């Protein structure tokens, strides 16, 4: 019987990315035992809508050398040894949810690109790989899933097709692991590849804490008596430093208010009353995994993900808030994610673009154009550092499509 280990927080975030229905959620379940689609509409439609997090311990058997997520080796029955705890981020693969995937991509330290053997490379496979390229994520493993649906020749054909597809991209040297998430086949080889190709980033715990908010909630049930109400909860991932229960925190850009007919945003400060990581209450939380931060905020401010896109840190230590941005822009040659090949037209003055900055998304009206720069007035302000990457999308038909990226300039 395996000994009970003390709880460890996940130390690395690994994205599950790829086209809709290629098996990202099934693979997450095969690795973690958790079905991340728990939203009622997700269960009804059978697709991921919100970003799901699921933690797993990667363990190695000292006897047969195989990797698994179980305390007892499923291959030889010996007790396994703990390697590290990781958090899998299950991102939506549906084209209409691309901006949600981009918010998740900003939190990923590495990614598993899932491609179904029966369908091969599809439009959102391209779009998700480009999203990883845009956020600068180079730690990638490719899972060629659903091999149970095709013969050996087809698997080899898909392997060559994928090799061709990733040439010249951040995934050019990524290993391609044939698996069946449904039957758990080759999952040990996939875990070995994750251990080799997706290292835990070196982090400085003494840096000022910074957490990107992905969601927020009111956890009080309807009809709770006033004396039993608890403050609003914000969920996200710490990207640097650490947070402790009792810390005073600032949230930027904060909450909207109206002044002279215009919407403005005001940063807010509050105190951390509880911290949850990996489903457990902890006194201190670090980068890695989804962290739930209990606060003294009015739950009205946090219900229904109202705080998503904010940045949390110590008062006075957060990056600036921008109402206008100057971006050094790099446009792609072709629009990503469409069936037909469309060239990316130059950005025009007065055009409205969709910008993803960390977990925040905002509309930007183009007010000025330089040789390689674009000036934009933002609909919702963002909290970001000079030099941060911004994903740029344009409306093509009825969908927002990735057309490039930029870096924030002074």
Curated annotation (Swiss-Prot):
Region (G1): 18-25
Region (G3): 90-93
EC code: 3.6.5.3
Main enzyme class: hydrolase
GO molecular function, one term: metal ion binding
Chain sites annotated for binding GTP: 21-26, 145-148, 180-182
Region annotation (G2) ranges: 46-50
CDD domains registered for this protein in UniProt: eIF2_gamma (cd01888), eIF2_gamma_II (cd03688), eIF2_gamma_III (cd15490)
Positions annotated to bind Mg(2+) 2: 21, 46
Subunit structure, interactors included: Heterotrimer composed of an alpha, a beta and a gamma chain.
NCBIfam families hit by this protein: eif2g_arch, PRK04000.1, small_GTP
Protein name: Translation initiation factor 2 subunit gamma
Provenance organism: Thermococcus kodakarensis (strain ATCC BAA-918 / JCM 12380 / KOD1) (Pyrococcus kodakaraensis (strain KOD1))
Lineage: Archaea, Methanobacteriati, Methanobacteriota, Thermococci, Thermococcales
Gene: eif2g
